Amino acid sequence: MKKKVMMSFLAIVLILIIAGVTIGKSLMDKYSYSKERADLETYFHVSGDRAAIVLQDEVIEEQALIRGGRCYFDLDTVHRYMNEIFYVDREENLLLYTDAVETISAQLADNDGTYNMTEGVQDLGYPVCLVEGDTIYLAADYVKQFTNYDYQMYDKRVQVYTEWGERMQAEIKSKTAVRVKGGIKSEILKDLQAGDTVELLEQMDNWSKVKTDDALIGYVENKRLGVIDAVQETPVTDYEAPAYTNIALDGKVSLGFHAIGAKIGNSTFYEMASEAKGMNVIAPTWFSLCDELGNFRSFGENSYVDTAHKAGLQVWGVLDNFNYRNETKTPVDEYVVLSSTSKRQKLVDGIVITAVNLGLDGINVDFEQVASETGVHYVQFLRELSVACRKSGLVLSVDNYVPFHYNEYYRLDIQGEILDYVIIMGYDEHWHGSGDPGSVASIDYVTNGIEKTVSMMESSKVINALPFYTIVWTTDGATVTDEYLTLNNTADFLKQMSTQPQWDEITCQNYLEWQSSAGLKQVWLEDADSIRVKLNVMSANEIGGVAVWRLGYGTDLVWELIRAYSAS
């Protein structure tokens, strides 16, 4: 009997021991800290010679290339986060960087580490760039030659800083680990000792998101954190970019475009200039791209410039991409010219030399209907032309459409930095041949164009161009036709009307419509009343001046308004 009791007792004890061990193990499993370490390739989603990029305090989608112990970033990454000035010409195997004073060039493929500057050939000591398939990589150190940013390489990751400010720093008060997620079972990224510091990214109830000094982002228990301080970061200022020096006229610019279709048109200077009260710049349409090699045709004459100077006027010769094409019906694709460094340079050199030889004061670029795929090459052309004009003491201005999202590739923000003046063509809201009757330049359209442009640059660089014309629209069923009406012909036009125009508060223009045998006629007039309102908006935005398209279309009253505006 005693033996049976003893056996039962031992069995119960054994069961309790087993249960205790099981429960203890379960409790240990539940409450003990995992010692599993994270695989960094898996954590960062990298393999081979790729490394994650930690930009500021965030792992971004783009990755770095580590080659020969050196760090490279692909061109898109450089453009997006560091410096968008780098330009590539694959056909001519060139990597270019154009600042305010020069263009630095390097061989693109098979680069030996050298690059060319005005002061001579420089050597980075290893390839400036690598080309792998369709992807171009730039050496991080080469980018730093022209950019204020910082980077540090670590195992499977590169820390990049492009911005600096105040960060929160926490001291570790006892031994712990940074884990992938907030939980004791999460894998370990790094062990920390008492006295180490981490950047505090986000503080939560029990765990906080932190970044270690070697760019690992994870979580630490709050109870392991000690003193938290605000630390001011020190910005990188190693690179000092050459200044974009600009030429500015004394007072407002008052520019008149002089439409010239042949050299004989230069003889109309006195006729055109005599009407223009207060004008201080005349811009003859002399130059037009004439082939796909970088050549242009010219109607320029020294005698015209001399005469203009004696009349107290500056002369800015206009270079366009459409007049020769329209006159001769010769197809000229500006993409072919602007995407080629050698052709682009030929155009830049040619127009600047011609301008200097003619004694011009400036160059005005009027490239219209530039395709989006040409945009990056057009901007590079303007960069290179701005350097050449700066060296030659020429004013550089560029004509632009009113800015909208669909023409952002004209890059008014960049133009505002590199140019002397940015001219907004404050018209063509509804244009000839559009089949869409409406105002050529309503006040909202003009105001939005000015305000958007001013938001991207110094207001003193902005010039708003006014139309000295409007359009008479005829709608017959689904058919819409139109014809131009100039300011100087408007009075005679209205004398023929049996009805008089009424002021439209929405467009701030005098509006007239009537029924004719041809259909419904509509016209939003440009006259002294509408021009006065536009000039008031220009004054309110304190822009750099006014331009008019074109000389020969104006009236004494409108020119008197412009003279008063320019003198204010």
Annotate each predicted stretch with a short phrase:
Residues 265-292, 350-363, 534-546:
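Catalytic domains of carbohydrate-active enzymes, especially glycoside hydrolases
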Residues 254-258, 280-284, 315-319, 363-365, ...:
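Hydrophobic faces of well-ordered beta-strands that scaffold small-molecule active sites
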Residues 170, 214-225:
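A short macromolecule-binding patch
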Residues 291-299, 349, 372-496:
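Substrate-binding surface in catalytic domains of secreted glycosidases
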Residues 195, 207-212, 220-221:
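SH3/SH3-like beta-barrel fold
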Residues 2-205, 234-248:
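Primary recognition of N-terminal secretory signal peptides and signal-anchoring hydrophobic helices
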Residues 239, 324-334, 468-534, 565-567:
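Glycan-binding loop/region signatures in secreted carbohydrate-active enzymes
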Residues 232-345:
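Glycan-recognition patch characteristic of GH18 chitinases/ENGases
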